[in-house]
Amino acid sequence: MKSKYSIFCMFLLRGFIFLGTVFSLNSAELRLKDIARIEGVRENQITGYGIVVGLPGTGDSKTPFTSESMKNYLKNLGVEANLKPDQTRNIASVLITATIPTYSRKGDKLNVVVSSIGDAKSLEGGVLLQSPLKTAGDKTYAVASGVISFGGRQEQERGSSSRGNKKTVGVVHGGAIVEQELDQNFYASERVQIQLENQDFTTLNAIVSKIRSILPGKHGIGPESVVPISPSEINIVLGKSFENKSDAFLTLLSDIENLTVETQTKPKVVINERTGVIVMGGNITIEEVAVSRSGLNLSVTDKNRRRNWLGKEQEPTKSSFLIEESTSVGDVVEALNKVGASTKDIIAILEALKKSGALHAELEIQ
């Protein structure tokens, strides 16, 4: 049974973007590769230190190691320079982070995140100089450089003080080039271990049953070889019948990845504080609860009664939000947008609803 969905709301209101998705079904048939991974096939974190140049006077001004780093960088290029901390307003020190897949090859490009570690006001307009990226073992696997870009838009006209408006964190798309491949020992094992992204006994049981019904007939693997070892792990014992990197082994892995199982959709609300985007399932409901937030007044009734939208109060006193049981998160966010609530207000209210137990969904703030 395929999941049907439609976008039910997309609007821009005072610099705040709201996206909602309505799922008509609570379950969906998904491929195994979409909800789990095979052990050994994973991403690895790499990080490094770098310098951003070309800033329009928004760089570091009181960060001594920035001038020292720039001086050493120029020295390696054969240029002698005596920079002082107050002469670095067009450069900034940053930390660089990226993820590298296990099977990345030399020359592959990766996106990198660049974050200011000094007192720079903004990295907008800056260029990251060539910087090595290493793992925890201090081995260089990639080199990053390029123009820093930013997503979303500022909310200054709404009076928001979100740290996302300062633009001290940006992305260099395809800015890192892989120079060294990761060590691989995936094929050394005589088993395949499947790891679910989320612990769920219902999904685990469905996967085990599906694998046991398909593998014996096509690949000659007995049902007893498929063993669940935890709420999120399944072990498939292959023995020596499959040679490493053989066509039969690769076909087996492909068949496992493309098995389809019916899963339950997990209610989730995702908020990106930097860009002001909210994504949620349309059927996420809220129990009856009272919420107070200074300067706003909202009253929402249940689905069988007329809704009453109220704007900002004239008096700067605390206001009450009456949210009836079965009201959806989408209704609440839409109402808050109508009365001019900021991103900070919406995040604070949703966090309070979650902590009180009124919001029955996972809340993720990015």
UniProtKB/Swiss-Prot annotation:
UniProt xrefs under Pfam families: FlgI
Signal peptide boundaries: 1-27
Family under the similarity heading: Belongs to the FlgI family.
Presence of keyword Signal: yes
GO molecular function: structural molecule activity
GO CC aspect terms: bacterial-type flagellum basal body, distal rod, P ring; outer membrane-bounded periplasmic space
Stated name of the protein: Flagellar P-ring protein
One BP annotation, GO: bacterial-type flagellum-dependent cell motility
Keyword Metal-binding: no
Subunit structure of this chain's protein: The basal body constitutes a major portion of the flagellar organelle and consists of four rings (L,P,S, and M) mounted on a central rod.
InterPro entries noted in UniProt: Flag_FlgI (IPR001782)
Subcellular location: Periplasm; Bacterial flagellum basal body
Protein function: Assembles around the rod to form the L-ring and probably protects the motor/basal body from shearing forces during rotation.
Keyword annotations from UniProtKB, A to Z: Bacterial flagellum, Periplasm, Signal
